[in-house]
Amino acid sequence: MDKEKFQQKAVKQTKQKKSTSAEFLMVKEYTDATEGAGNPGFNMSSPELPAHQTPQEKVVRHDMLDHTLATHQQKSRLPASAGPKGVTSVLIVLTLAALLIRPGCPEREPGIPLKRACTASVEDLFGARVGGDAAEDLCTHWVQVTHSFVGEGYERMNSLFFGRLR
């Protein structure tokens, strides 16, 4: 058993020696190819360097951490809180709520349930057949969002938007 292990190790060591020498030769060939041994225009250390090419020192000097792709991607990411805020959000939400509430709906009184007072015409807006409950839920959601954005001034905004629809 020990003899077999010893032979296997010996075979592995000879393979490793061959592969390292082969890798050394491949690296040498690669550096010759990249340096452009046959073409002085591609050889950076050549005295026949064309005028439009810059020496390698200048290229390395300008290669700073800020110019890497990863740093650029990190800087270009928006903060987590980015998005429409303030008046823009209020106007978007109110416009969508105005579209979802049918112009013929009566003004919502405090005693009237929300689902009975506002029924959305989703078929007209999106061209899809949606049941009454889904339309009412959608309308309810947008009215609640509008209430959360506008707060106390909702009734004034309600008459401003929905008064024009009639």
UniProtKB/Swiss-Prot annotation:
| Positions of disulphide bridges | none
Q: What Pfam families does this protein's entry cite? A: OFCC1 (PF15680)
Q: Which GO terms describe its cellular component?
A: cytoplasm; cytosol; endoplasmic reticulum; microtubule cytoskeleton; perinuclear region of cytoplasm
Which residues fall in a coiled-coil region?
none
Where are the annotated segments for Disordered?
Answer: 1-22
Q: Which domain of life is it from?
A: Eukaryota
PANTHER family assigned to the protein according to its UniProt record, in alphabetical order: OROFACIAL CLEFT 1 CANDIDATE GENE 1 PROTEIN
Q: What is this protein called?
A: Orofacial cleft 1 candidate gene 1 protein homolog
- Source organism of the structure: Mus musculus
